């Protein structure tokens, strides 16, 4: 009888450890979409496609592709997060759809927040006009660049 109780206790401990160690899914802030997917295209320095869905980097603006600096911004993103990489996209709760039907969000790839990386590298600028309408405006990186 005593060994049966210990057996059950051990099983419960193992189950508890399993739920602590195994993550329950992607971790995002807010209530909007939180998706994990594969990068299918790097459009430019502030837009990628994830499983075919266009994602615009929240609070980040890079030059257009017809400008040399736009090409450099795209190359920067490609180095960190090449096509085929798995990304986590945290959709901006306060901007659930941007221009051209793109989702707007914070993108994490290979341990890097792409929004922040583009700004840190000097390939982009903070979009200050959205600082009052973005969930991410109070992030450390957004504040550092002018939100």
Language-model segments: what does each one mean?
Residues 2-147:
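Small beta-barrel nucleic-acid-binding modules, primarily SNase/OB-fold domains
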């Amino acid at each position: 009888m005593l060994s049966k109780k210990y057996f059950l206790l051990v099983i419960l401990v193992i189950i508890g450890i399993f739920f602590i160690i195994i993550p329950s899914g992607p971790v995002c802030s807010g209530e909007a979409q939180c998706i994990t997917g594969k990068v299918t295209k790097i459009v430019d320095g502030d837009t990628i496609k994830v499983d075919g869905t266009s994602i615009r980097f929240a609070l980040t603006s890079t030059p257009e592709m017809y400008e040399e600096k736009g090409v450099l911004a795209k190359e920067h993103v490609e180095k960190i997060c090449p096509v085929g990489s798995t990304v986590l996209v945290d959709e901006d709760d306060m901007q659930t759809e941007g221009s051209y039907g793109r989702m707007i969000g914070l993108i994490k790839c290979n341990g890097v927040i792409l929004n922040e990386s583009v700004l840190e590298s000097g390939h982009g600028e903070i979009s200050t006009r959205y600082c009052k309408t973005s969930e991410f405006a109070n992030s450390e990186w957004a504040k550092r660049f002018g939100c």
